[in-house]
């Protein structure tokens, strides 16, 4: 007799996954969360938002791209969730917002409860780092659509900001200083090229590189930095962030101009910080041109912000106090909207 399990969907495995992930999800709860895990929808009170003059909700949705494939190959699934959260909450923070809550979506060929719980463990860790509550999610088993061992991960975040505090870049002026925050490595973009490079050169993910201080796989799988606390620290120091860019897919050439008004150009000095060894290794092994690297990857800077020259010292101190590494990387000039790397 045919049943759902024989068709490829194991309901009992789904129940077990939920039980295993509960301990991780509970750690992310905030006072504003109403109800518990397992409801038809997640509920989050907005009562505290009344403290803002004109509260604006911000939303972000993203995934981890083909970095997920790397986690599958390495059979290490407890950090990829951090990437999913980071990709969403960093975008919200770029607009001056504070993340409120997060939801995840996992599509898999077969539900292996321990693996799903590991993925959610990473999601919960990302939520803890950004102080967002994990109020819901979905794990969808897709037999026949995906191989049993494969999965994809995406997320959705909601945050809030007072309208007067939204970072728009509108008042950026010539002379403003650009400050970059160090990345942990490749973060979550450009992994199709990463995999092609190392497939072509037949490099093993288990290969240890002295310049990396770890194996290739460990360096590539390093989770995306979450900059929410650092940007909050800057704001609490009394600094007005004029513009902010999350350096993701498209690298510097696509993302930096997004924070600029017309008639303003960002000039970034490549020698103002040390490019991480993983990027140098990728460029060398894959014979990738420098411009392509900067047009694809963060090259060591996961976030770039513009501040008034008088606020540079306070900004640097606030970022350091939040546990991130800042660099003064350039300045704003008059000129055609865009970015110049020199």
Task: List PLM regions with ranges.
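Hydrophobic face of alpha-helices
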Residues: 18, 117-120, 191
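Acidic, glycine-rich loop-and-beta core segments that form the ion-binding/anion-interacting portion
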Residues: 174-218
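Glycine-/charge-enriched secondary-structure boundary and capping motifs
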Residues: 2-7, 115-130, 146-151, 204-205, ...
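Buried hydrophobic packing segments
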Residues: 17, 21, 43, 88-89, ...
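Residue-level detector of flexible, active-site-proximal loop/helix-junction positions
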Residues: 18, 50, 65, 141, ...
């Amino acid at each position: 007799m045919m049943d759902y399990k024989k068709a490829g969907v194991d309901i009992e495995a789904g129940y077990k996954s939920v039980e295993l992930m509960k301990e991780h999800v509970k750690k992310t709860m905030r006072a504003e969360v109403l109800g518990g895990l397992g409801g038809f929808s997640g509920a989050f009170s907005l009562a505290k938002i009344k403290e803002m003059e004109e509260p604006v909700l911000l939303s972000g949705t993203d995934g981890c791209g083909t970095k997920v494939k790397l986690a599958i190959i390495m059979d290490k699934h407890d950090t990829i969730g951090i990437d999913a959260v980071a990709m969403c909450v960093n975008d919200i923070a770029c607009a001056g917002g504070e993340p409120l809550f997060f939801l995840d979506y996992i599509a898999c060929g077969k539900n292996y409860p321990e693996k799903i719980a590991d993925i959610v463990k990473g999601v919960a860790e990302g939520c803890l780092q950004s102080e967002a509550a994990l109020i819901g999610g979905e794990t969808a088993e897709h037999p026949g659509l995906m191989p049993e061992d494969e999965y994809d991960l995406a997320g959705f975040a909601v945050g809030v900001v007072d309208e007067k505090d939204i970072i728009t870049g509108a008042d950026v002026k010539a002379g403003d200083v650009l400050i970059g925050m160090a990345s942990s490595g490749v973060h979550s973009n450009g992994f199709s090229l990463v995999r092609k490079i190392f497939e072509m050169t037949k490099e093993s993910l288990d290969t240890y590189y002295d310049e990396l201080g770890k194996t290739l796989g460990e360096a590539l799988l390093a989770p995306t930095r979450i900059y929410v606390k650092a940007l909050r620290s800057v704001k609490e120091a009394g600094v007005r962030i004029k513009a902010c860019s999350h350096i993701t897919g498209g690298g510097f050439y696509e993302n930096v101009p997004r924070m600029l008004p017309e008639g303003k150009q960002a000039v970034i000095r490549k020698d103002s910080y040390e490019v991480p060894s993983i990027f140098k290794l990728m460029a060398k092994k894959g014979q990738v041109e420098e411009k392509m690297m900067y047009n694809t990857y963060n090259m060591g800077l996961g976030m770039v912000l513009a501040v008034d020259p008088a606020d540079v010292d306070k900004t640097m101190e606030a970022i350091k106090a939040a546990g991130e590494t800042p660099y003064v990387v350039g300045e704003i000039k008059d000129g055609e909207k865009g970015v110049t790397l020199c």
